[in-house]
C-alpha cells in the first residue's frame, strides 16, 4: 500500500515556528498543502491505484479529495488511521458536520465523535495502527491502495518520519516495519 501523509496545514506552519500547539482544531490545508496534494495526485495517477482510504480529519479528506478526483476512484473513510490525539489539531469535526461538508463520501462507519477526548496512550495508538496493518494485509488489493493519513500513523507502521505529502510504499503482509520504500521526495514540513 502507499502511505501518504496529508498536505501542509496551518497547524504545520505555526507549530513549525516554535514547536508549541497553536490551538488550531481540525486544520484545513494551506495553499501550499493543496499544491502538494495536486503533485501527489499526479504521481499516483501514474500508478495503478484502485482504492483510496482516508482519515476523517479535514486535512486528510482535502488531500484525498484531490487524489480521488484526479485518479477517479472513491474515498473510503476510516477512523482507524486518524492521528494520535496529542494536540488541538487532533480534535476532529463531528461526523454529521463532515457529512454535510462532504456529501459524496460515506461517513456511516465512524462515530459522531470519532476522536478520543484525551491524549491517546502510545500503546493504544500502536495497537490501532497494528489493527489497520492486519486488515490491509488480509485485503487482496493492498498493493493498489493509497492511504491518506498522518505522520504518527506512518511512523507507527513503518518507523519512518515523512514530510507533508511524501509517500511510502509499505507491504502490510510483513510484520516488520523495515519494509517501507520512499515513493516521492516532494513533501515539505
Predicted feature residues:
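Active-site-proximal alpha-helix that buttresses catalytic centers in soluble enzyme cores
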Residues: 2-77, 99-101, 165
Amino acid at each position: 500500500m502507499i502511505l501518504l501523509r496529508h498536505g501542509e496545514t496551518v497547524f504545520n506552519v505555526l507549530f513549525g515556528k516554535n514547536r508549541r500547539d497553536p490551538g488550531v482544531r481540525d486544520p484545513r490545508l494551506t495553499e501550499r498543502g493543496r499544491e502538494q496534494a495536486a503533485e501527489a495526485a499526479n504521481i499516483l495517477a501514474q500508478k495503478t491505484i484502485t482504492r483510496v482510504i482516508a482519515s476523517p480529519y479535514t486535512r486528510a479528506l482535502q488531500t484525498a479529495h484531490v487524489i480521488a478526483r484526479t485518479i477517479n476512484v472513491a474515498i473510503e473513510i476510516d477512523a482507524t488511521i486518524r492521528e494520535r490525539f496529542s494536540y488541538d489539531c487532533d480534535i476532529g469535526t463531528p461526523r454529521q458536520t463532515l457529512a454535510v461538508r462532504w456529501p459524496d463520501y460515506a461517513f456511516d462507519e465512524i462515530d459522531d465523535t470519532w476522536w478520543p477526548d484525551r491524549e491517546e496512550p502510545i500503546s493504544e495508538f500502536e495497537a490501532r495502527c497494528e489493527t489497520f496493518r492486519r486488515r490491509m494485509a488480509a485485503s487482496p488489493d493492498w498493493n493498489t491502495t493509497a492511504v491518506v493519513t498522518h505522520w504518527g500513523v506512518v511512523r507507527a507502521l513503518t518507523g519512518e518520519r515523512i514530510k507533508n505529502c511524501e509517500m511510502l510504499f509499505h507491504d502490510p503482509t510483513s510484520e516488520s516495519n523495515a519494509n517501507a520504500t520512499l515513493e516521492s521526495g516532494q513533501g515539505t514540513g
